[in-house]
C-alpha cells in the first residue's frame, strides 16, 4: 500500500477522487463513519461509486438508504460483504442479502462500536455479555466470570477509513459537529489509512487543542466538502389540527 505523506501541508487533496487515489483498491476492507445518514462522508462515497473498485468489505453502522450513502455502492455491486448493525432502511441491501448475493456479519450496535475501538487501540479481542444465548454467540467462544456469561468478540481493523468531520486544521486535527461524531472517531482509529471529509479547513493553531476531538496523528488525507447535502433519513412532522 502506498505511503501517505504526513507533513502539515501534504494532507489536503483537491477533491474526493484525488483523496482516494492510490490507497483504495479491490478487495479491501473499509470502515465508513456515520449513524444512518448522519455524519457520513458523502463526497468520498460518491467518488468511490464512480471508481472501478469492487469486492469491498465495508464496516459501518448502517448500509445507507436506496440511492444515497452506502446504498450507492450496493446498487453498483461494489460491496461484497457488510459488517454492520442497522440495515433496515435499504431495500436493495435486503434483496441482495436474501438472494445470497451479499455477505453479512451482523453485530449489536454497542458491540460493533467496541470492536472498532478495540481495533484502534490494539486490543485483539474482548468479552461482552451482549448476545450471549442468542444467534450472535453462535460459533464464538463463551466464558463465565463471577457467575455471568460472556461472548468473545474480536477487534475490527480496516485497510482504509472514510470519515466525516465538521472542521479540520492543516495537520488533520478534527472537530466533529454534535451527533455527527457518532462512529467516525472509532472508524478513523481502526483504519490503517484514514481519509477525512470536512466542511472547513483552517490553519494549524486555529483550533483550540482542548476542542480537538480526534488528533491529526490518526488522519492521513483531507478533502473539503463545504456544502454536503446532509439528507434527512426519517422526517417526522407534527400533524396539523383537524
Curated annotation (Swiss-Prot):
Keywords: Lipopolysaccharide biosynthesis, Transferase. Pathway: Bacterial outer membrane biogenesis; lipopolysaccharide biosynthesis. It catalyses: a 3-oxo acid + succinyl-CoA = a 3-oxoacyl-CoA + succinate. It holds the Pfam family CoA_trans. CoA binds at residues 33-39. GO terms for biological process: lipopolysaccharide biosynthetic process. The keyword Methyltransferase does not apply. GO terms for molecular function: succinyl-CoA:3-oxo-acid CoA-transferase activity. The keyword Cell membrane does not apply. SMART domains: CoA_trans. Its EC number is 2.8.3.5. Belongs to the 3-oxoacid CoA-transferase subunit A family. Heterodimer of a subunit A and a subunit B. This is Succinyl-CoA:3-ketoacid coenzyme A transferase subunit A.
Amino acid at each position: 500500500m502506498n505511503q501517505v505523506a504526513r507533513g502539515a501541508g501534504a494532507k489536503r487533496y483537491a477533491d474526493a477522487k484525488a483523496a482516494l487515489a492510490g490507497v483504495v483498491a479491490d478487495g479491501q476492507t473499509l470502515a465508513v463513519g456515520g449513524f444512518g445518514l448522519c455524519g457520513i462522508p458523502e463526497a468520498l462515497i460518491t467518488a468511490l461509486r464512480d471508481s472501478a473498485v469492487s469486492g469491498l468489505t465495508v464496516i459501518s453502522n448502517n448500509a445507507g438508504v436506496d440511492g444515497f450513502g452506502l446504498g450507492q455502492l450496493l446498487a453498483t455491486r461494489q460491496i461484497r460483504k457488510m459488517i454492520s448493525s442497522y440495515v433496515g432502511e435499504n431495500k436493495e441491501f435486503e434483496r441482495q442479502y436474501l438472494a445470497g448475493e451479499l455477505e453479512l456479519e451482523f453485530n449489536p450496535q454497542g458491540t460493533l462500536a467496541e470492536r472498532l475501538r478495540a481495533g484502534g487501540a490494539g486490543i485483539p479481542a474482548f468479552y461482552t455479555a451482549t448476545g450471549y444465548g442468542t444467534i450472535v454467540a453462535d460459533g464464538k467462544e463463551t466464558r463465565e466470570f463471577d457467575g455471568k456469561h460472556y461472548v468473545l468478540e474480536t477487534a475490527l481493523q480496516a485497510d482504509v477509513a472514510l470519515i466525516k468531520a465538521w472542521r479540520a486544521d492543516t495537520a488533520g486535527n478534527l472537530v466533529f459537529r454534535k451527533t455527527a461524531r457518532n462512529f467516525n472517531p472509532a472508524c478513523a482509529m481502526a483504519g490503517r489509512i484514514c481519509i477525512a471529509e470536512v466542511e472547513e479547513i483552517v490553519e494549524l493553531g486555529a483550533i483550540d487543542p482542548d476542542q480537538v476531538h480526534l488528533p491529526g496523528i490518526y488522519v492521513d488525507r483531507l478533502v473539503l466538502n463545504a456544502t454536503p447535502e446532509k439528507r434527512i433519513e426519517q422526517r417526522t412532522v407534527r400533524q396539523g389540527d383537524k
